[in-house]
Amino acid sequence: MATEMALVKPISKFSTSSPIFSNSRYGKFTTVRMSSTSQSTTKAAAKGGKKAAKTAIKETLLTPRFYTTDFDEMEALFNTEINKNLNQSEFESLLQEFKTDYNQTHFVRNKEFKEAADKIDGPLRQIFVEFSERSCTAEFSGFLLYKELGRRLKKTNPVVAEIFSLMSRDEARHAGFLNKGLSDFNLALDLGFLTKARKYTFFKPKFIFYATYLSEKIGYWRYITIYRHLKENPEYQCYPIFKYFENWCQDENRHGDFFSALLKAQPQFLNDWKAKLWSRFFCLSVYVTMYLNDCQRTAFYEGIGLDTKEFDMHVIIETNRTTARIFPAVLDVENPEFKRRLDKMVEINEQLLAVGETSDIPLVKNLKRIPLIAALASELLATYLMPPIESGSVDFAEFEPQLVY
């Protein structure tokens, strides 16, 4: 599951615009029993090996989330006796794609990882740790959800259940690869602790479909865009994980294709006015969350030679065009007004963060936040109410496996 469904708390800005290298070595290995929302861990890693404090997980609107759903309703949706719209032949084709396991031998590390990590220093090192932490947490949350769906649907619809199980395999592989990467920075996430300690956010099945489809597709466009950029600009290739993004993004794409098939099998989620409203809502939620988070991490994108806002808008536009093939309505993200409002939200969010960093008592902070939250809500509503693009159709050609680049 891509990071956009489980984004994290904004971090402090840094002025670094390119990788900083040194020959320093880093000390003790630390197991971290927390999410990436804790800055103390990352700072300890950046400084080189002080044991990080085991702080509590802090929940915000932009914090990584683990999801659960109504599994009984899921079973009813995929019961072939109840739902005659299920296209089992399409699911069978998708199952064969997942069974092929194109990336079975792809995620193999080499000595480049540790050597590159030892050369990354200062603010960029801190940001790489946060990138790995939040990405690992997001992939692991997808693993848990898909694994449980695979288990619960085994009797109701074995084909769909097996696809979910194979997707959990992919997510576990991604999370493990990222967590191993943290060892290059002398850290590791305690995923077992995360499983027990995290709060789970409940989403109805149809919301899981909307949000996860967008998450997987936006993940594809993020990964392939970074991969293409670094292939053309190898001087910014400061850590080898990016070399794996070309194949990695195809896992995200296949997962998105599966959720597209799930939506087509439930036309009630696509063919009425409520579906149009929810489609626009989830597009807005995913796009805004990504934009706000990334604009608080410009040092990461600048460190690999990208302009953060240009990168995000490219990803949003491409994701929106892909999403328009299945969602009944999408946002008009290519309207200049859309980006203008995103940038305004970034300004408001920065003011909110600044309030949180003051030494004022909690009551005063909350009073200062009220007008800012109202302004942010106003911008969100105005963006949501922009004239949408009518789109989508459930009249698709038969599924044909293909790579998309």
Swiss-Prot record:
Read off the InterPro entries from this record. AcsF (IPR008434), Ferritin-like_SF (IPR009078), Rr_diiron-bd_dom (IPR003251)
Q: Where in the cell is it found?
A: Plastid, Chloroplast
Annotated GO molecular function terms are:
magnesium-protoporphyrin IX monomethyl ester (oxidative) cyclase activity; metal ion binding
Which pathway does the UniProt entry assign to this protein? Answer: Porphyrin-containing compound metabolism; chlorophyll biosynthesis
Keyword Plastid among UniProt keywords = yes
EC number(s) reported in the record: 1.14.13.81
Q: Which UniProt keywords apply?
A: Chlorophyll biosynthesis, Chloroplast, Iron, Metal-binding, NADP, Oxidoreductase, Photosynthesis, Plastid, Transit peptide
Q: Which family does it belong to?
A: Belongs to the AcsF family.
What does this protein do, in the record's words? Catalyzes the formation of the isocyclic ring in chlorophyll biosynthesis. Mediates the cyclase reaction, which results in the formation of divinylprotochlorophyllide (Pchlide) characteristic of all chlorophylls from magnesium-protoporphyrin IX 13-monomethyl ester (MgPMME).
Name-wise, this protein is: Magnesium-protoporphyrin IX monomethyl ester [oxidative] cyclase, chloroplastic
**The organism's taxonomic lineage, starting at the top:** Eukaryota, Viridiplantae, Streptophyta, Embryophyta, Tracheophyta
A GO biological process held by the record: chlorophyll biosynthetic process
Leading EC class? oxidoreductase
Q: Which reaction does it catalyse?
A: Mg-protoporphyrin IX 13-monomethyl ester + 3 NADPH + 3 O2 + 2 H(+) = 3,8-divinyl protochlorophyllide a + 3 NADP(+) + 5 H2O
Kindly state one GO CC term assigned in the UniProt record. Answer: chloroplast thylakoid membrane
What species does this protein belong to?
Gossypium hirsutum
Say where the protein is mainly found.
plastid
* Cofactor(s) the protein needs: Fe cation
